[in-house]
Design a protein with these regions (language model features):
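N-terminal signal-anchor/first transmembrane alpha helix
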Residues: 1-60, 90, 94, 121, ...
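Alpha-helical transmembrane segments of integral membrane proteins
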Residues: 2-6, 97-130, 176-340
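An internal, D/E-rich "acidic patch" concept
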Residues: 3, 60-116
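Residue-level recognition of pore/gate-forming positions within transmembrane alpha-helices
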Residues: 14, 22, 44, 112, ...
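Hydrophobic alpha-helical transmembrane segments of membrane transport/permease proteins
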Residues: 17-68, 157-196
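Alpha-helical membrane-inserting segments
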Residues: 24, 28, 118, 122, ...
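Residue-level signal for discrete positions within transmembrane alpha-helices
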Residues: 96, 100, 136-143, 152, ...
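A hydrophobic, multi-pass inner-membrane permease signature
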Residues: 141-149, 193, 200
């Protein structure tokens, strides 16, 4: 089985998943009480105006026609019009999605930078105090609600210590950098604006640490498990018998092989971070997709909520596709195994 045949299979799978998400979101949107045409027109609109809007949206057509039109629009990049703002949902997502991605990427980077070394040390010093501490941290991270942890760090670092800002992406008196990528850190660097860069970095620390804490423990446990498996292999004992230094064996022999089975977990963590950002952004008043969709839910903005579900699901499946291809590139035996 070649790389391109596997890529073709994964892409078909991606299309099927997105189609399935469209089916689910369409069904849910029609089960929820409420009239989108009435919500869009307003409470004081006449029945004639509401009926005109219903005809424009195609809500007076049979359900199968509405569904076919909805799926066709989704695959053309048209997610409908937001009831709350009157703007296309895709335009709204282009505004808020970069903020969520910046938070998710920074959180994943923190989880990897801290979690991988902890996992290595936990495996090397198995059943010692650091190993027990890492396992306790993993259990604590998984079981601690993100909103509770976020409120805790705000009270500590913003309320008592006054070390870091408690919300937002920038101080109110600063103008955002010129939009290039939508990531304030990168855009500020491209603009050469150090003041905006460091201010954006300060605002990013608390929410990214909060979001990274759960996945930090997961990454550490995954690396620990894979490292313990590799350290018990025959080639490690052979390397030790050859007189190679212990940490050289750990970092140059065991770690690369331990990272291979960890790629899936590390990649899918990014997809989880997109979902986890909803509560975190709400707590920290972070102007991303999470805070936007919470406001849309409160306003019964069905097109916005459905668009959020489709885009995040697509991003999650796309990350899964990249992980599968990366896994195949790192270990080509997977493709040969599938062919056999």
């Amino acid at each position: 089985m070649t790389f391109w045949s596997i890529l073709r299979q994964r892409c078909w799978g991606l299309v099927l998943v997105v189609a399935g998400v469209c089916v689910i979101t369409f069904i849910i949107s029609h089960l929820i009480p409420g009239d989108p045409a009435r919500l869009l027109a307003g409470d004081r609109a006449s029945e004639e105006i509401v009926e005109n809007i219903r005809q424009q949206l195609g809500l007076n057509q049979p359900l199968y026609v509405q569904f076919a039109r909805y799926v066709s629009d989704v695959f053309q990049g048209d997610l409908g019009i937001s009831i709350r703002t009157g703007r296309p949902v895709m335009e709204e997502l282009r505004v808020f999605f970069p903020a969520t991605l910046e938070l998710a990427f920074c959180s994943l980077l923190l989880a990897l930078v801290i979690g991988i070394p902890l996992g290595i040390l936990s495996a090397v010093w198995r059943n010692r105090w650091l190993d027990h501490l890492v396992r306790l941290m993993a259990i604590t991270g998984i079981s601690t609600p993100a909103f509770w942890l976020g409120l805790g760090v705000i009270v500590l670092f913003y309320g008592h210590l006054q070390m870091l800002p408690g919300g937002g992406r920038l101080d109110d008196w600063l103008d955002p950098p010129t939009h290039v990528t939508g990531f304030y850190l990168i855009d500020a660097l491209l603009e050469g604006n150090g003041e905006v860069f460091f201010n954006a970095l300060q605002h990013l620390i608390l929410p990214s640490l909060t979001l990274a804490f759960v996945h930090l423990g997961i990454v550490a446990r995954q690396i620990r498990s894979a490292m313990l498996e590799q350290l018990s292999e025959d080639y490690i004992r052979t390397a030790k018998a050859s007189g190679l230094p212990g940490w050289y064996i750990v970092l140059c022999y065991a770690l690369p092989n331990a990272l291979i089975p960890s790629i899936t977990v590390l990649g899918l963590a990014l997809g989880d971070l997109l979902y986890g950002a909803v509560l975190t952004e709400t707590v920290f008043a972070w102007p991303g997709m999470g805070a936007w969709v919470v406001t849309s839910i409160q306003a019964l903005d069905f097109p916005a909520v459905m668009g959020f579900a489709v885009v995040v699901s697509f991003a999650y499946v796309l990350v899964n596709l990249v992980v599968d291809l990366l896994y195949l590139w790192v270990d080509p035996r997977i493709g040969r195994g599938g062919a056999e």
